[in-house]
C-alpha cells in the first residue's frame, strides 16, 4: 500500500467558468493558471505522484513549457494514473476536499466524482469529493481563490 497527499491553490481572475474536478462550474470569474486551473485534479495528481515517489505535477507538466498552456487537467490526471499503473499499482480510494467560499460546489459534486472515477478507471465508491468553506477567513474566505487537498491510497494491482 502507498499513501499520497496533494495540495493546490489558484487565484480567481479573468472570466468564468471555474473548472474543478473535471467539471465546468458556472462563476463570474475563472482561475488564473497555466493549464485549465483545476485545483482538485492538480491536488489529485500531486497525491498520486507523491504515492509513487515521482515528485509533483510541476515536475512532469512545468508551467514554463508552452506545451501545457491551457492543458485539460483530466488529460494530465490520466497521464499520471498511467504512471501509477506502470508501477503495478491501482487506486484503492481517493478523498478530495475543496476549500472555497464560492462558487457553490454541492450541485456539481456527483459529476466531479464521476469524472474522477472515469479517469482513474475505478468505481464511484472509491472516489469521494467534498467541499467546505473557510468561514470567511483567509484568501478563500475573501473569495480570492480556491484551495484543494487530496489523499489517495494505492494498492497492488489485483489483475
From Swiss-Prot:
Catalytic activity from the UniProt record: 4-CDP-2-C-methyl-D-erythritol 2-phosphate = 2-C-methyl-D-erythritol 2,4-cyclic diphosphate + CMP
Coiled-coil parts of chain: none
Chain residues that bind 4-CDP-2-C-methyl-D-erythritol 2-phosphate: 8-10, 34-35, 56-58, 61-65, 100-106, 132-135, 139, 142
GO MF annotation list: 2-C-methyl-D-erythritol 2,4-cyclodiphosphate synthase activity; metal ion binding
InterPro entries noted in UniProt: MECDP_synthase, MECDP_synthase_CS, MECDP_synthase_sf
Pathway per the UniProt entry: Isoprenoid biosynthesis; isopentenyl diphosphate biosynthesis via DXP pathway; isopentenyl diphosphate from 1-deoxy-D-xylulose 5-phosphate: step 4/6
Cofactor(s) this protein requires: a divalent metal cation
Comment on bound cofactor: Binds 1 divalent metal cation per subunit.
CDD domains referenced in this protein's UniProt entry, alphabetically: MECDP_synthase (cd00554)
GO BP: any one term: isopentenyl diphosphate biosynthetic process, methylerythritol 4-phosphate pathway
Residues annotated as site: Transition state stabilizer: 34, 133
Protein EC: 4.6.1.12
Residue positions binding a divalent metal cation: 8, 10, 42
Pfam (any one): YgbB
PROSITE patterns on file: ISPF
Family: Belongs to the IspF family.
PANTHER family linked to this entry: 2-C-METHYL-D-ERYTHRITOL 2,4-CYCLODIPHOSPHATE SYNTHASE, CHLOROPLASTIC
Biological role: Involved in the biosynthesis of isopentenyl diphosphate (IPP) and dimethylallyl diphosphate (DMAPP), two major building blocks of isoprenoid compounds. Catalyzes the conversion of 4-diphosphocytidyl-2-C-methyl-D-erythritol 2-phosphate (CDP-ME2P) to 2-C-methyl-D-erythritol 2,4-cyclodiphosphate (ME-CPP) with a corresponding release of cytidine 5-monophosphate (CMP).
Description of how the protein assembles with itself and partners: Homotrimer.
Protein name, per record: 2-C-methyl-D-erythritol 2,4-cyclodiphosphate synthase
Taxonomic source organism: Aliivibrio salmonicida (strain LFI1238) (Vibrio salmonicida (strain LFI1238))
Gene that specifies this protein: ispF
Amino acid at each position: 500500500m502507498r499513501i499520497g497527499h496533494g495540495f493546490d491553490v489558484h487565484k480567481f481572475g479573468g472570466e468564468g467558468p471555474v473548472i474543478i474536478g473535471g467539471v465546468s462550474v458556472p462563476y463570474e470569474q475563472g482561475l488564473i493558471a497555466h493549464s485549465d486551473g483545476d485545483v482538485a485534479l492538480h491536488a489529485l495528481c500531486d497525491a498520486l505522484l507523491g504515492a509513487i515517489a515521482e515528485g509533483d505535477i510541476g515536475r512532469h507538466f512545468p508551467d514554463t513549457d508552452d506545451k501545457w498552456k491551457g492543458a485539460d487537467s483530466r488529460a494530465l490526471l490520466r497521464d499520471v494514473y498511467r504512471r501509477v499503473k506502470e508501477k503495478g499499482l491501482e487506486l484503492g480510494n481517493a478523498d478530495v476536499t475543496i476549500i472555497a467560499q464560492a462558487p457553490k460546489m454541492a450541485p456539481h459534486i456527483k459529476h466531479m466524482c464521476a469524472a474522477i472515477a472515469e479517469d482513474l478507471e475505478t468505481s464511484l465508491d472509491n472516489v469521494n469529493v467534498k467541499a467546505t468553506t473557510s468561514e470567511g477567513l483567509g484568501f478563500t474566505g475573501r473569495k480570492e481563490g480556491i484551495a484543494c487537498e487530496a489523499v489517495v491510497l494505492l494498492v497492488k494491482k489485483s489483475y
